[in-house]
Amino acid sequence: MSRDAPIKADKDYSQILKEEFPKIDSLAQNDCNSALDQLLVLEKKTRQASDLASSKEVLAKIVDLLASRNKWDDLNEQLTLLSKKHGQLKLSIQYMIQKVMEYLKSSKSLDLNTRISVIETIRVVTENKIFVEVERARVTKDLVEIKKEEGKIDEAADILCELQVETYGSMEMSEKIQFILEQMELSILKGDYSQATVLSRKILKKTFKNPKYESLKLEYYNLLVKISLHKREYLEVAQYLQEIYQTDAIKSDEAKWKPVLSHIVYFLVLSPYGNLQNDLIHKIQNDNNLKKLESQESLVKLFTTNELMRWPIVQKTYEPVLNEDDLAFGGEANKHHWEDLQKRVIEHNLRVISEYYSRITLLRLNELLDLTESQTETYISDLVNQGIIYAKVNRPAKIVNFEKPKNSSQLLNEWSHNVDELLEHIETIGHLITKEEIMHGLQAK
């Protein structure tokens, strides 16, 4: 069982180690096993004396002895045994594991199976030990990289997502964020968007207010864009892109902000109409940078002006520009975005018509919307259910009524207002008649 080091060691072995290490080095040249045995004797003495500094030196020496001679199986065995020794110091175990990790990193020629076996040994030794949780996380990441190179994405995602790095108090914030971002990315590659969403909530967005996390912020919001695109949550995509757009590294470089601002426009026009969508699209319209993007500016203007649009004309005008964009409209994968854009155009037209007409025939409405009767009724039903417009369809008469019926309170208020207005007019007329009578009386005299 491991333990914390006491404030003061029972005995200082530093001088003894200085004398013994040269002898052990000499012995190791001919008999590695005997050298290892002597080091294990020293390890026991330093451990029992609670001499942390000397214990670290001995454990590091054991790692050097075995790793430098490629005795990785022996190293795995010693790492397992020494970590279980009674009274073993926590910091000594941590130091030994760190030394093994250094050798793993520097041994580029090490065969894959051996590398995996050492990583797995470290993972077993560090399991459920808080004082080596960071080391466990780092070797797990190395194992995940190997799995990714082998194309085992699902396995890599499962291994990495086991780590609850957000609870690691000894890990730097930037490293925590990097781990969670990689967990999110692997979950997306695996196709588990629900897990990716859960993982994204482990990062506090206010953390990104610190400029030193700017690159991580961009990576984080790009991953959120992928998640929301999969869910077809266009308004969320636009909001995440806006966070990217507001980042100094993007805002200061025209080559970077132009595509981001274009994407914001595209996903705002793809978003269903609502208070937030309407607010955001008007804010974007007032952005001075939008003037440098002619096509995008004119597209925003179409959706913020109370005028009807013809879908065939919109498609013909913007198709060449929009098809160049791989994220929003280009390629077969984004074909459904064109369908959604057509829906938004029709919904915009229906809102405009509901403002200008109190009643309209279905035949005329079909002509204005370029739709069949059943399609028109479907769109009316959808917008009514969303609470965006009021409409009632009289099927026998084939008339659509957009005028909302007034309740008793509204009718009473309107009647009261009309009566007040009528009395004011009567009073004004009375004054005018009196004035005329006076003028006529003066003229008669």
Curated annotation (Swiss-Prot):
SUPFAM superfamilies: Winged helix' DNA-binding domain (SSF46785)
A Gene Ontology BP annotation from the UniProt entry: protein deneddylation
Post-translational modification N-acetylserine, affected residues: S2
Pfam families per the UniProt record, alphabetical: PCI, PSMD12-CSN4_N, RPN5_C
Highest taxon, organism lineage: Eukaryota
Assigned keywords, A-Z: Acetylation, Proteasome
InterPro entries reported for this sequence: PCI_dom, PSMD12-CSN4-like_N, PSMD12/CSN4, RPN5_C, WH-like_DNA-bd_sf, WH_DNA-bd_sf
Function: Acts as a regulatory subunit of the 26S proteasome which is involved in the ATP-dependent degradation of ubiquitinated proteins.
Additional detail: Present with 5710 molecules/cell in log phase SD medium.
Name by which UniProt lists this protein: 26S proteasome regulatory subunit RPN5
Source organism per UniProt: Saccharomyces cerevisiae (strain ATCC 204508 / S288c)
